[in-house]
Amino acid sequence: MVLLTMIARVADGLPLAASMQEDEQSGRDLQQYQSQAKQLFRKLNEQSPTRCTLEAGAMTFHYIIEQGVCYLVLCEAAFPKKLAFAYLEDLHSEFDEQHGKKVPTVSRPYSFIEFDTFIQKTKKLYIDSRARRNLGSINTELQDVQRIMVANIEEVLQRGEALSALDSKANNLSSLSKKYRQDAKYLNMRSTYAKLAAVAVFFIMLIVYVRFWWL
């Protein structure tokens, strides 16, 4: 289930639009998650990963960044990641068309609160079970969600560093992993060459032995 949707400007974390599931409908207090979302917005910058999943216990945040705007959704952890990102892509397409040019000029929080109407309509589409089955088949062109960075929301917020730093560490780990694989391949090649050289030396010595002692 989609429980919370927020849109914010990356440059300063200013909330532009939001839609929250009513507490009595969801049976959960979403204020804590809304607070975490606002903290996250303040940590984003131009170097932050443009696609990210943040685990929050039984819930999961997903976000995308497009044209300097962050589109974030809070879902139950069991909600399919592919659908969550397809939902965010739909919001981006409509929001950018309606308000994209105005985003850099606004200074008041929730200047586009009327966008909630479209959010609610789109959310119902993704929650409906039959629609979800259809969406699951038509969104095959969505980027590989398995490659999207995954982190823990509490660790990101408590670490006190920008999300870009976390992304940098992930890239460093990827580089180290690649270097390790290259080094391992090089060592395997050296080992193979050493074995071949040993075999060659054996046969040369055998030929020399036969030639000088038996001929």
From Swiss-Prot:
GO MF annotation: an example: SNAP receptor activity
Membrane-crossing residue ranges in chain numbering: 195-215
Keywords attached to this entry: Acetylation, Coiled coil, Endoplasmic reticulum, ER-Golgi transport, Golgi apparatus, Membrane, Phosphoprotein, Protein transport, Transmembrane, Transmembrane helix, Transport
Residue ranges of coiled coil: none
Longin domain residues: 6-119
Cytoplasmic topological segments: 1-194
N6-acetyllysine: modified positions: K38
GO CC term, one of those recorded: Golgi membrane
Domain v-SNARE coiled-coil homology as annotated: residue spans: 134-194
Cellular location(s): Endoplasmic reticulum membrane; Endoplasmic reticulum-Golgi intermediate compartment membrane; Golgi apparatus, cis-Golgi network membrane; Golgi apparatus, trans-Golgi network membrane
GO annotation (BP), single: positive regulation of protein catabolic process
Short name of any one Pfam family annotated for the protein: Synaptobrevin
Phosphoserine modifications at: S137, S164, S168, S174, S177
Modified residues (Phosphothreonine): T140
InterPro entries: Longin-like_dom_sf, Longin_dom, Sec22, Synaptobrevin-like, V_SNARE_CC
Topology versus the membrane: Single-pass type IV membrane protein
Location (main, coarse): endoplasmic reticulum
CDD domains in the cross-refs: Longin, R-SNARE_SEC22
Record-linked Gene3D superfamilies: 1.20.5.110, Longin domain
Oligomer and partners: Interacts with STX17. Component of two distinct SNARE complexes consisting of STX5, GOSR2/BOS1, BET1 and SEC22B or STX18, USE1L, BNIP1/SEC20L and SEC22B. YKT6 can probably replace SEC22B as subunit of either complex. Interacts with the COPII Sec23/24 complex composed of SEC23A and SEC24A; recruits SEC22B into COPII-coated vesicles to allow its transport from the endoplasmic reticulum to the Golgi. Interacts with BET1.
Function: SNARE involved in targeting and fusion of ER-derived transport vesicles with the Golgi complex as well as Golgi-derived retrograde transport vesicles with the ER.
Family in the record: Belongs to the synaptobrevin family.
Protein name: Vesicle-trafficking protein SEC22b
Primary gene name: Sec22b
